[in-house]
Amino acid sequence: MLVLGSLCPAQSSVRGAETNSVQFTEPAPYTTQEEIGRRFGFAIVPPDYDLSRERFRLEVPSAQQTNLVRGLLVWLSPGDDGYFPPLWQEVLARHNLILLAPLQVGDQRHAIDRLRVALDGTCNVCRNYRVDRRRIFVGGYAGGARIASMVGIGCGDIFTGTLCICGVNFHLNVPVGGTQYYPGSFYPNPEIVQSARTKGRFVLVTGDGDPEADKMKAVADLGFRRDRFNNVTLLLVPGIAQATPEASTLEQALALLEASASTNAAPHSKYPQRQN
């Protein structure tokens, strides 16, 4: 599917949301060295990592309603500040989505650390809030989007939707003509990939001026679709290199990601529930 989006420089503020910088101490069951290897195919020894030293930006809509069931968007930035466009924050509030943005995990950080931080944060939010398992999304911009695409495929049994803006990775080589191709950058277990193929929803956002546009179009058509992923949408936003996509583009993307929420079964009960 191909959909046109648009740009807008306006900004807005969030009403009724609570924003905190938080830390967690208990790792997720799916961030062990064995699980990272199974999900992403990395054979190297991962760097030293201490979850208790990591920080996250956490924004909870209608925080005063403690028993409200919410969705979750884990947002990955190319920089260390966990930047999330202010004009999008009201969209998340309308969709009743918690925002979790890891800090200090920009493009200079080791890829395995970025994956582990995102997954540990996801698990801990699910331990502390009532999260709708049918609406657990991961997204990002540029280098953050490349990591998000890896999470969406390698953790298709956890995340139900993936939003990639101006960046994407894929697990297979993607041909671009002749002997040229975009190389696959990770190697997940085939059973994990099958879960992402059949249940995951992927929205790729690009447009004129995006240096990654050709790759994103190729990955959408000759990667995801050729590899039989069921739900992949390419959104084209004119002038995307000059401004942030407007709120209506995020609305489009979330509508596509949420389309299956009423029919998808919740993930297996091994995933953590809220601790009362």
Residue spans of the language-model regions?
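Bacterial N-terminal signal peptides
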Residues: 1-6
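A domain-start/cap signature at the N-terminus of enzymes
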Residues: 10-71, 184, 220-222, 232, ...
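Gly/Ser-rich "nucleophile elbow"/oxyanion-hole loop immediately N-terminal to the catalytic nucleophile
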Residues: 63-69, 110-143, 153, 158
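Alpha/beta-hydrolase fold active-site loops
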Residues: 68-71, 97, 160, 200-201
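Active-site machinery of serine-nucleophile hydrolases
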Residues: 70-127
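Alpha/beta-hydrolase
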Residues: 74-76, 165, 237
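Primarily recognizes the serine-hydrolase "nucleophile elbow" in alpha/beta-hydrolase
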Residues: 134-196
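The feature captures the conserved acid-bearing segment of alpha/beta-hydrolase catalytic domains
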Residues: 170-252, 258
